[in-house]
Regions:
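Metal-cofactor-dependent catalytic cores
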Residues: 1-138
Length: 138
């Protein structure tokens, strides 16, 4: 399979969820910090209806139509770039949202600030469409 990806880190895809962002923003609010937008994390794909996406390592995310399937390989460890507002260049309180992400840890075994899942495409080339119905399987 031939694949190309620009500006990627270790994996070609970063998948995040609106539920994870909501949980993070609740934590930021509780810490009296400003909320952040999804563009702060620069995901390729954002899904809705998946709680605790960061805990889903080893699962597959696929289109109900069977057109494509992603393998969720590991939670994405976040660096200090997420402290920078992508629209203004303003730096948040130097430790946010990283400090809150650490507090929201998804596992006692792994330390750090994580948001989203690094993923690979397990199926043929495909078109991903806004509104696709997805299913999560282990």
């Amino acid at each position: 399979m031939k694949a190309q990806s620009a500006f990627s880190d270790q994996f070609p895809y970063l998948i995040t969820s609106w539920e994870s962002l909501f949980k993070l923003n609740q934590g930021l609010h509780d810490n009296h910090s400003k909320e952040v937008s999804m563009n702060r994390f620069r995901p390729n794909i954002v899904v809705q209806g998946v709680d605790d996406l960061e805990k889903m390592t080893g699962s597959d995310l696929s289109c109900d139509e069977g057109d494509y399937r992603f393998g969720l390989r590991k939670p994405c460890k976040r660096c200090k770039i997420v402290t920078i507002n992508q629209d203004t260049g303003e730096i948040m309180e130097p430790k946010e949202p990283l400090a809150t992400l650490v507090k929201l840890k998804f596992s006692d075994a792994i330390k750090g600030a994580f948001f989203g899942q690094n993923a690979i495409l397990l199926s043929k080339d495909c078109a991903i469409r806004v509104g696709d119905e997805l299913k999560l399987s282990s």
